[in-house]
Amino acid sequence: MITKAIDNCFQHAKRRGWAKTYWAFDVHGTILRPNYKTNQISKEFYPHAVNVMQMLNRRKDIVKILYTCSYPHEIEQYLEYFDQYGIRFDYINTNPEVADGGYGYYKDKFYFNVLLDDKAGFDGDTDWEEILSLLKKHTID
């Protein structure tokens, strides 16, 4: 399911001549396995999540947005933890690059092309490997 959305995103961007696409990433149940503990951030990555996120960080055509309901102090801890693995995000819970336009109002719901979130059906145990294979096919020209 997620690979179809990503493939469609790449095809659409190519047809439209977009220089960038916007991907939103949840933390719990998506990048990291949830630990269900208060005052202790999750630290167990799903298989292939680190490799994929590092690949995405090398691409200038993908803007990475951290999409999380974590508390601000937890977000800081997650950003520090991710940074140890070379995983960085361009924005947190916002996309200031896409302003309101003829197609949508983006002040209350930010714009993205791809959403990776367990609540949207993302399966951290299987989807990262599928994304890894897909990204190897969609290299930057």
At which residue positions do the language-model features occur?
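HAD-like aspartate-dependent phosphatase fold
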Residues: M1-D141
